[in-house]
Amino acid sequence: MKRILYWLAVLMLLVGCSAQRGTATIPPENSAVVIAILDTGISSTAIDRERLLEGYNYVTNSEDTEDRINHGTAAASIIVGCESAGITGLAPEVLLLPLVVTDKVDGKVTGVTPKVLAQAIYDAVNIYGADIINVSLGIKKDVDAVRKAVEYAHKKGVLIISAVGNDGEDGAFYYPAAYDIVLGVGSHNEDGEVSEFSHQNGSADLLAPGEDIWMASRNGAVYGAKGTSYAAACVSAAAALLLTENPKMAPEQVQQALYTNAMDIGSPGWDMQSGWGILKLTAPQLQ
């Protein structure tokens, strides 16, 4: 029996709608929006291979981008869907580029290092031609190398969308989400309120569904989880829909379009807890 995430269905109604590292993976004639997924990899068992580009594993220094943890595959399924799990993606026509920045090695999950995170951002821009970089993770320190990589991507016209973190109201800043030029994403619940676990420190620009979410595991099964990681994937999908219809939009234009159309909650306008409000796109904004 197919399950379709309630919040993804809501958003869909609102919308209306291979190579080695160092070479271009996108055919010149292909106009599909490319989202780089800096995460744990993406399972080719769960996600349609036609939606996947060949990426790189910065942990093992190899081309093995299969997911051994689930996190990256879950985010990917929100964006492009997973047939075996019965999940309909928000932007099923985009291409996903798996860049592995954390992995399971010898049974242990490796942490994300600033060096690896920065390099993956540079490569997403320079080698793989990504339009959007989704970072559903982060580090708790403002590191010069990461900040410079983010600034470089922005100057090159690549939008970075990142989760703000799950440590609650008093949570410390997560980077890159805390950088001003990055679109930071927090989570809201079914009642349209900021999730208790979502950081409320001013780093969130938008809120998106992050609770009671059905997504795909690396084996292609459906499972439930929560977190700002998955809210970020929702926003990346929405941004990809905008770029599909308006491919020349600059990162700040995409951000402004999303902010302008957000459903404001809390204090009028931007506020520390919810940013500009809840992600909302309507058909006219996609024309």
Identify the role of each PLM range.
Residues 187-229, 266:
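Catalytic-core environment of secreted peptidases
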Residues 130-135, 156, 181-184, 196, ...:
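C-terminal subdomain of the subtilisin-like protease fold in secreted/lumenal serine endopeptidases
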Residues 2-10:
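Sec-dependent signal peptide recognition
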Residues 25-35, 40-54, 62-113, 179-181, ...:
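Subtilisin-like serine protease catalytic core
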Residues 230-247:
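Short, small-residue alpha-helix embedded
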Residues 121-143:
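Short acidic, glycine-rich surface-loop motifs adjacent to enzyme active sites
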Residues 15-16:
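C-terminal motif of bacterial Sec signal peptides marking the signal peptidase cleavage site
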Residues 142-160, 175:
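Catalytic-core regions built around general acid/base machinery
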